[in-house]
C-alpha cells in the first residue's frame, strides 16, 4: 500500500482483527442472508453457528494450533465454515489444485492425517493419499449438502454428475461431513486457541508457470490487509448488490479474499455457484 496515492490511504489503517472478528464487525445483522447456495438462503447467524461447530469438530478429529488442514473443496459454504473454524483453533487451511501427485505431495509435507474433499473423490485417489502420505481418512462433502436439490436446475445437476467416478471413495476411511460435525459434539476440551492475527491461516500454492510450484502462507493480518483496502463500496438502505461467484476455485488466496470474503464483509449477497460450467454462466446470471 506504500505505492497508493497519499489521499487514498491517509485515513486507511489495517484493522487489528481476526477474520471472524472482521466479519462480525461488518455483519449487517444475524438474520440477514449472507450466502445463497442453490436454493438455500444462509443467514449470518447460521454462518457463525457453523463456524463454531466446525471448529469443535476439527478439534475432535485431532487438529490443533499450528496444524495444517488439507482442503480440496470447491467454493461451497462448507469451505467458509472450515476457514473460520480453522482460525478459531489456530490451524491453517492447506489448499492446492494441481495434479494428484502434487496434491499428495502437499498433504505429505503437512503431515495431516485427515483431509477434506468432495464425495466424488475416487477410491483410487483416496488409496493414493493413504499410501503416499500420512492420510488416514477423508471427510467428504456432497455438493448437495447445503443445497435444496429441487431448486437446482438441470444443467447444474448434469455438471455435478460429471464429476463422479465409477467408484467414489467409500468405507470406514471416508467420513461424511454431517457425521464429522456430529462426532465433534462429543469433544469435551477447549476449542479456541489464543488469539493471534499473524498466525498462518491460509496456505496456497502458486501455479508453477514460472518454476516449481511454491507454497505461499497468509495470516488473518495479511488477508484483512488486502480485504480492507478494497472494502469501500457496500450496500445502502435502498439497494443491496448481489455477487455471483461461479467456477473459481478457493485454492487461490485472491479468490478467497476478493471473491468470497469481500462481498460478505461489504454487505453484498454472496451467491455461490461453484458447479456452473463456464458456458452456462449466462443461464445463471439470468436466473439470479
How should these model regions be labeled?
Residues 90, 224-243, 250-288:
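Conserved AMP-binding/adenylation subdomain of ANL enzymes
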Residues 73-84, 98-101, 247-265:
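Conserved coil-to-alpha-helix start sites within the AMP-binding
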Residues 48-53, 183-187, 216-237:
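Conserved structural elements of the adenylate-forming
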Residues 43-45, 192, 201-228:
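Conserved AMP-binding A3 loop
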Residues 33-84, 100-104, 218-221:
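Conserved AMP-binding/adenylate-forming core of the ANL superfamily
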Residues 88-179:
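Structural core segment of the AMP-binding/adenylate-forming
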Amino acid at each position: 500500500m506504500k505505492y497508493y496515492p497519499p489521499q487514498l490511504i491517509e485515513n486507511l489503517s489495517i484493522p487489528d482483527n481476526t477474520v471472524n472478528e472482521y466479519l462480525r464487525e461488518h455483519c449487517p445483522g444475524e438474520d440477514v442472508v449472507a450466502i445463497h447456495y442453490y436454493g438455500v438462503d444462509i443467514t449470518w447467524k447460521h454462518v457463525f453457528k457453523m463456524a463454531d461447530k466446525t471448529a469443535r469438530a476439527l478439534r475432535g478429529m485431532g487438529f490443533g494450533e499450528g496444524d495444517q488442514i488439507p482442503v480440496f473443496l470447491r467454493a461451497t459454504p462448507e469451505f467458509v465454515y472450515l476457514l473460520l473454524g480453522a482460525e478459531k483453533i489456530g490451524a491453517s487451511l492447506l489448499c492446492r489444485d494441481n495434479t494428484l501427485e502434487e496434491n499428495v505431495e502437499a498433504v505429505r509435507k503437512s503431515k495431516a492425517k485427515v483431509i477434506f474433499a468432495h464425495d466424488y473423490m475416487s477410491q483410487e485417489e483416496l488409496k493414493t493419499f493413504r499410501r503416499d502420505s500420512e492420510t488416514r481418512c477423508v471427510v467428504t462433502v456432497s455438493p448437495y449438502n447445503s443445497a435444496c436439490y429441487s431448486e437446482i436446475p438441470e444443467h447444474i445437476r448434469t455438471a455435478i454428475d460429471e464429476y463422479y467416478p465409477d467408484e467414489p471413495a467409500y468405507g470406514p476411511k471416508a467420513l461424511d461431513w454431517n457425521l464429522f460435525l456430529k462426532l465433534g459434539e462429543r469433544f469435551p476440551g477447549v476449542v479456541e486457541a489464543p488469539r493471534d492475527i499473524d498466525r498462518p491461516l491460509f496456505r496456497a500454492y502458486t501455479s508453477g508457470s514460472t518454476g516449481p510450484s511454491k507454497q505461499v502462507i497468509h495470516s488473518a493480518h495479511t488477508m484483512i490487509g488486502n480485504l480492507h483496502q478494497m472494502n469501500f463500496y457496500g450496500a445502502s438502505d435502498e439497494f443491496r448488490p448481489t455477487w455471483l461467484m461461479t467456477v473459481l476455485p478457493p485454492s487461490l488466496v485472491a479468490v478467497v479474499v476478493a471473491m468470497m470474503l469481500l462481498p460478505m464483509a461489504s454487505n453484498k449477497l454472496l451467491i455461490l455457484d461453484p458447479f456452473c460450467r463456464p458456458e452456462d454462466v449466462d443461464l445463471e446470471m439470468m436466473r439470479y
